Amino acid sequence: MRCLTTPVLLRALAQAARAGPPGGRSLHSSAVAATYKYVNMQDPEMDMKSVTDRAARTLLWTELFRGLGMTLSYLFREPATINYPFEKGPLSPRFRGEHALRRYPSGEERCIACKLCEAICPAQAITIEAEPRADGSRRTTRYDIDMTKCIYCGFCQEACPVDAIVEGPNFEFSTETHEELLYNKEKLLNNGDKWEAEITANIQADYLYR
């Protein structure tokens, strides 16, 4: 059996391509190809008006100037964006931001160490330790939130029976180290003291739906 060299093989393939498919019938001339419809193919209109319009668009760059005119029109409109961080948009009363522990007007901590927030947290970001006081009430000795685990679902705020743990209006609390996002009780109480007015207003605005 003779082995075909590369030049011979290439010549054979070229002759087969010129001869067409077996049977001598091309796909483009078959009955199936005759039924094809070119949906997006449009023949250009050749009447005088259409030819003149196409020539004007090509020679005078009408579409280019139309686009430039639209761009210039937006320069004199009211901007749709704000200059953050110097300007800030409104926040919903239901906005879930940085966590905080609240106090009563007397200064007493609201948290009763029921641990419902710790139990309901799907990310297991909350750690609570508590002990009874001399008057028989329970108060937390440790209240930690790992903000790197928190998913800001708001379940802790919804589960709290005394509105102690809340998610405040602050969303600007980026840090440079991981340790700064490990909140302890003191940090959470300071947040509550700082944002108490806004938190109270948000709770009152949303009381019908709580």
From Swiss-Prot:
Name of this chain's protein: NADH dehydrogenase [ubiquinone] iron-sulfur protein 8, mitochondrial
Co-factor note (free text): Binds 2 [4Fe-4S] cluster.
Compartments (UniProt record): Mitochondrion inner membrane
Taxonomic placement: Eukaryota, Metazoa, Chordata, Craniata, Vertebrata
Binding site for [4Fe-4S] cluster 2: 121, 150, 153, 156
Cofactor(s) essential for the protein: [4Fe-4S] cluster
Chief location bin: mitochondrion
The gene coding this protein: NDUFS8
GO MF term list: 4 iron, 4 sulfur cluster binding; metal ion binding; NADH dehydrogenase (ubiquinone) activity
GO biological process: mitochondrial electron transport, NADH to ubiquinone; mitochondrial respiratory chain complex I assembly
